[in-house]
Amino acid sequence: MENNKTTLRVSFAAIDPYIETYIVSPTEKSQNGRGWVEWGERNGYADYLLELSKQAPTLRAVINGTVDFIVGDDITIAQLPDTSYIPGVMNTRGDTIISQVESIARDLETYGGFALQIIRNALGKIVEVYYCDVHFLRSNKDNTVFYYSENWTSGKRKIVEYPAFIHISPEKWASLSDEEKERNYNSILYVKREHTQTYPLPVYCAAVKECEIERCIADYHLNAINNGFTSSLIVNFNNGVPTDEVREEIEKDFNEKFSGHQNAGRIMFSWNDNKDAATTITEPKVEDFGDRYKALSSHVRQQIFTAFRANPNLFGIPTESLGFSQEEYESAFKLYNRTAIRPAQRLIIETYEKLYGQPGVISITPFSLQAETEKTVQ
């Protein structure tokens, strides 16, 4: 008895692609022949943190809010000696101490550290201070030499080398050789919260996965709007299977006209030899999906706030409680101010005191809830 076998060819198009997220770990690796230590795989950890801070809503809210708290209501600093800048101006470009502290505070919260570029005059006196974007910097193992590039992930990059900043008295500067002076005219002051490795770690490093989950949730909903994670329409062609070229052309025409976010879904195509061979789709259903999604969103947000030791209400993110009184807000702010804001302000103040070589050159007026209850940080 002869068995008649029919080969059924079915082609599907426009099925949504799998979105792969790549979490970069803060590994450190020295390369032979290179002076710097790589910061993450393919030198991409800083870039990864920057993108994460832009795309994870809760993380961005906490960073932005914390920066506002650190900068406070006002910042004053003594005039740089031997300069004609107006008070509060830090360089010939006109950067103010407030804008500079805002930038380094953002780096401190995003990466766990910050950097300043220090310019000296011929006598060795500091005459200019610039904010230096820490994510463009790489360093040797002990942070004595720094390398600046605006594209560390590319093979073709321009790299500028700088020495680490050291405080040198005018007397000692005069005793330096011309070569040593030339090397130290332009230097980098590199500041880290932790000193356990070459590069800093952000306070939320233990919650990076939660930040990534939150970003993926946003991507999920965007893709659901754009083209649907499950197709909203199946088109069966039951008059045989055409050539690959014909199928691709028909599928392309259909997708261009009918699919996308304006048509609330994507189209799935099925090519069949006859109607009896039409494609059958079984859609898996998840019970209580809404409750699971809500629980997941709540969990990841809480983990991010836990990493910062912060109360969500401080950043305009409501909790499940029925309310948040002024008294509770003030209490939460005072705790966060004590455990996170003032230590960051102290680190910044100590950095500028190191530059000037004396204490008391800079003060930060705290972010005011009730101004009379707060004292100036000096």
Predicted regions mapped to residue ranges:
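Leucine-centric amphipathic alpha-helical interface motifs
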Residues: 1-48, 165, 298, 321-378
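Structured, contiguous alpha/beta core segments that scaffold functional sites
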Residues: 2-67, 71-272, 377
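A contiguous, surface-oriented mixed alpha/beta subdomain in the mid-to-C-terminal portion of proteins
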Residues: 193-351, 361-366
